[in-house]
Amino acid sequence: MRFSSCYIPTLKESPADAEVISHKLLLRAGMVRRLTSGLYIYLPLGLRVINKIARTVREEMEKAGFRELLMPMVQPGDLWKETGRWEHYGKELLRFKDRNEREYCLGPTHEEVITDLVRGEVRSYRQLPVRLYQVQTKFRDEIRPRFGLMRGREFMMKDGYSFDATAEGAEESYKIMYDAYMSIFSRLGLRFRAVEADTGSIGGNFSHEFMVLADTGEDTIAFCHDCEYAANVERAEVAWRGSPSTGGCPAMEKIATPGAHSVEELTALLGVPASAIVKTMLFKVDGKTVAVLVRGDREVNDIKLKNLLKAQEVELADAATVQAVTAAPVGFAGPVALDVPVYADAELQGGTDYVVGANAADAHLKHVDLARDAAVTAWADLRAITADDQCPRCGGRMELTRGIEVGHIFMLGLKYSEAMHAVFLDENGKERTMIMGCYGIGVSRVAAAAIEQNHDEHGIVFPPPVAPFECVLLNLDPRSEEVNAKVEEIYALLQGMGIEVLLDDREERPGVKFKDADLLGIPMQLVVGGKGLGRGIVECKDRRTGEKGELSAASLEQDFAAWSEKVRQGWASR
């Protein structure tokens, strides 16, 4: 493709409203343009990136035995009412009515539609498994769309679905998709991790997220250095390997703690470590108030609380609720004689001699033994993991890092098929409910994540499988007949070798072409100018390393083949 005939409106500066680096560079590289809040136009170069990602996804999905279909973006509200998600999904579901007052929504996902399709067709276990997928535009009415393609309202997604007759079959489908996702993200040249994850609004029995590692990632993941355990911090289990206290605990005593609302203020006042303090946090769980206890140097993981109580909504209680329940302002709540259910983090079990709030202003209790002095409803893993924790699987060293979620697979179980009566007859003629899995990849999000992970001060540094072109060919002297003729010869040669090449044939200064070549992030650069041709060479540059070299113009096919393989191997061995 020729630069002069391809619409690539590059920018020298980043637009003021662009926040993250992928958003800035996608705009500067002329790959996308904002239409309105959360909606983007994919320009030719950006669409090439999206299509290359989608092609890799399709190839691996087909290889895994999933078959492509295409479902409508507009979905009838009646299907969502069958599963209860019409009421529970929230304002992110864009609802509307047609001229006949029938309710519809723009699909953020397609579980209801695919289940309706399959329940209308499948009657016997002999027709299972059914494994289907689509690459489709989705819409989620985000309250604050931001970060460009990272969190837009409209986005491109691959969503796949499996229907099985048995739990064993469903687990096989899930494993097939897990392996396919590992292949997809490996082929795309991204550094990533598969992590255990919460099922969120999709629901189901368990799930894995696929995270592109990047310092700018919105999610934090915890992984073990000594085994394969990795999980989103929302899901990460905590292994407490301490020993319960064996010493006796003195009688509980009320003490004055004026103005000590926080753990930091309390430790300074009493001279005790934060680990000797128990925080009592009040939450509203589906409208009912509960208390959660964690050590003073820990944080509550509200997702774990939500899962423990099988709740729909969990939020921190406001100051008015705290005052009403404890008769004290925020900072002085405690578990003793508290008239709401109390859930304590397992790390506290067996421990004694704690400092807790006294449910009275400017007062705390010391020498508290939770088993003796408080009515704990249940003990459970309720705190957020830290880098100081041991691996829950092998006891090894844990590390926390940032990541960008680009894929998510779910073992849905019976969540949708039971609600929508998706049934079949088994080999004994007995009616059974289909067991489902669903599998998503944010295709447009992958493009942004690839840039978040791979960029430098000059622009994008695309991995070869994601880049819009493999090579950019720079004509430094388009007014020279000799240079033009050689450039055309090289252009034809590269195309004949099966190389995707962008020919920069613009009548621009060399400096402009060099800057744009770096900005676009195309992995390989070839530079043709009069001086080089006079020496019989073509200059080359590896965009990732910045390493420059020279290739013989006389044996360019062989030299380019060897050099390009070196560039690809460099990416593979990162």
Swiss-Prot record:
This is Proline--tRNA ligase. It catalyses: tRNA(Pro) + L-proline + ATP = L-prolyl-tRNA(Pro) + AMP + diphosphate. The keyword Lyase does not apply. InterPro entries: aa-tRNA-synt_IIb, aa-tRNA-synth_II, aa-tRNA-synth_II/BPL/LPL, Anticodon-bd, Anticodon-bd_dom_sf, Pro-tRNA-ligase_IIa, Pro-tRNA-synth_IIa_bac-type, Pro-tRNA-Synthase_IIa_type1. It holds the Pfam family HGTP_anticodon. Its EC number is 6.1.1.15. It comes from the Bacteria. Keywords: Aminoacyl-tRNA synthetase, ATP-binding, Cytoplasm, Ligase, Nucleotide-binding, Protein biosynthesis. Homodimer. Consists of three domains: the N-terminal catalytic domain, the editing domain and the C-terminal anticodon-binding domain. It is an enzyme of class 6 (ligase). One of its GO terms (cellular component) is cytosol. GO terms for molecular function: aminoacyl-tRNA deacylase activity; ATP binding; proline-tRNA ligase activity. The gene is proS. It is found in: Cytoplasm. The keyword Ligase applies. Gene3D superfamilies: Anticodon-binding domain, Bira Bifunctional Protein, Domain 2, YbaK/aminoacyl-tRNA synthetase-associated domain.
